[in-house]
């Protein structure tokens, strides 16, 4: 709410202690939403037992129970259920409506359950919308803190039991079963956000150096090419958005160019070997088997309704194999409608960022939106409750005007 309306309603200003309490509750709500979309299996990614065994029922109760807890916390912090008008959330809400339409004729309870879960997830995002656009980057910092906690447990697992954390040759969670692609995503997004904030003089140099060293090590051990490509492209786009105003950006680009040239000349064989991950030509051309699954998605028999609206929310797999593409997964679950809405939401964020005045919030939004765009081709997916939907929402939240909502304080 604008300060003018707040004064009209004669709402008293909140004290520092109350403001800290509000920030904590908003941050906790965001952390619970991240916990809700974390992967859980009763074993590590490579099939080994966890360092601290967690029964399957308890692990699923933690992740699935995080959403009701997030809703409760969001209602506590936003008791009047005030929401900020948002085109982005309006588009995402269309996916919820479409999911419930499919749920009316669902053959499996899982489709109905996932529809309600998506509805609750998006409702929680609506309840957090009054805190969008804050100058202190509250939601961005909350996301960085949350992902840092997840990565800390991953690194701790690597220290305690390297054989479990590096099972299968890729770094995954040994305390909590975070798979390598999600570990790499968290490391890449955290690194990208911190670097962009440092470029805009909103993060300390020593802190950025520490985060960079740890995140690069995690990315190296996770062997996830998509995350690295999305990170590089995202930082490049974000840097271009402020290269004319920040000398630090120009120095970074020049330094990276020199280092990249030296690496290409002296270590090209090592880098190529790491990127190949021991895969043959057939695996590379099929994107590690993804193209066969994508072809299976396209070839599934459909009637006209299913072409337009899909089969309903699922675990995004075909014949037991993950789809690993936001666009093909959207087509499977939500049809052409889901693809159009997902593309519209992403395009809205990018276009809004283009017309937003230059600044750190615009650069952060461009990094997140670009990261999601690059990753969307081989990862799922901001058409359902996921970390990618949270990150795209985070980008949208940075592009709204700053303001203080005193009715909530």
What spans do the regions from the language model cover?
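Aromatic-anchored transmembrane helix interface
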Residues: 60-66, 87-100, 107-130
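Alpha-helical transmembrane segments of multi-pass inner-membrane proteins
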Residues: 140-166, 178-241
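Long extracytoplasmic/lumenal interhelical loops at the membrane interface
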Residues: 46, 276-337, 353-357
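Hydrophobic transmembrane alpha-helices and their immediate junctions
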Residues: 334-373
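N-terminal signal-anchor transmembrane segment
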Residues: 2-77, 95-105, 157-158, 372-374
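Transmembrane alpha-helices of multi-pass inner-membrane enzymes
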Residues: 367-373, 382-409
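A membrane-periplasm/extracellular boundary helix in multi-pass inner-membrane enzymes
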Residues: 156-161, 239-281, 300-303
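Interfacial loop-to-transmembrane-helix boundary motif in multi-pass membrane proteins
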Residues: 25-31, 85-94, 127-154, 200
């Amino acid at each position: 709410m604008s300060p003018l309306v707040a004064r009209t309603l004669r709402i008293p200003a909140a004290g520092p202690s109350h403001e800290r309490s509000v920030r904590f509750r908003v941050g906790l709500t965001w952390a619970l939403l991240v916990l809700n979309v974390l992967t859980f299996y009763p074993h590590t990614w490579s099939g080994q037992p966890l360092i601290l065994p967690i029964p399957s029922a308890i692990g699923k109760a933690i992740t699935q129970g995080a959403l009701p807890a997030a809703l409760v916390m969001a209602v506590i912090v936003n008791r009047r259920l005030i929401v900020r008008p948002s085109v982005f959330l309006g588009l995402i809400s269309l996916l919820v409506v479409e999911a419930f339409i499919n749920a009316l004729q669902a053959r499996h309870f899982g489709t109905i359950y996932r529809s309600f879960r998506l509805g609750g997830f998006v409702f929680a995002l609506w309840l957090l919308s009054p805190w969008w656009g804050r100058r202190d980057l509250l939601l961005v910092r909350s996301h960085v803190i949350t992902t840092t906690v997840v990565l800390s447990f991953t690194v701790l697992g690597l220290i305690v039991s390297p054989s479990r954390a590096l099972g299968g040759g890729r770094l995954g969670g040994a305390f909590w079963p975070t798979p390598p692609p999600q570990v790499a995503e968290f490391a890449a997004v955290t690194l990208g956000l911190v670097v962009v904030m440092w470029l805009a003089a909103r993060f300390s140099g020593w802190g950025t150096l520490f985060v960079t060293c740890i995140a690069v090590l995690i990315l190296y051990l996770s062997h996830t090419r998509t995350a690295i490509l999305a990170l590089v492209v995202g930082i490049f786009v974000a840097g271009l958005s402020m290269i004319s105003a920040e000398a630090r950006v120009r120095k970074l680009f020049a330094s990276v160019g020199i280092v990249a040239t030296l690496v290409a000349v002296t270590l090209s064989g090592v880098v190529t070997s790491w990127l190949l991950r021991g895969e043959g030509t057939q695996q590379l051309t099929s994107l590690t088997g993804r193209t066969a699954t994508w072809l299976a998605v396209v070839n599934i028999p459909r009637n006209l309704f299913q072409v337009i609206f899909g089969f309903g929310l699922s675990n995004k797999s075909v014949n037991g194999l993950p789809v690993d593409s936001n666009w093909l997964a959207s087509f499977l679950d939500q049809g052409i409608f889901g693809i159009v809405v997902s593309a519209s939401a992403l395009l809205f964020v990018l276009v809004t960022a283009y017309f937003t005045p230059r600044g750190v919030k615009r650069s952060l939004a461009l990094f997140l939106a670009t990261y999601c765009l690059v990753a969307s081709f081989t990862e799922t997916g901001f058409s359902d409750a996921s970390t990618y939907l949270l990150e795209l929402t985070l980008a949208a939240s940075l592009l709204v005007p700053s303001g203080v909502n005193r009715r909530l304080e």
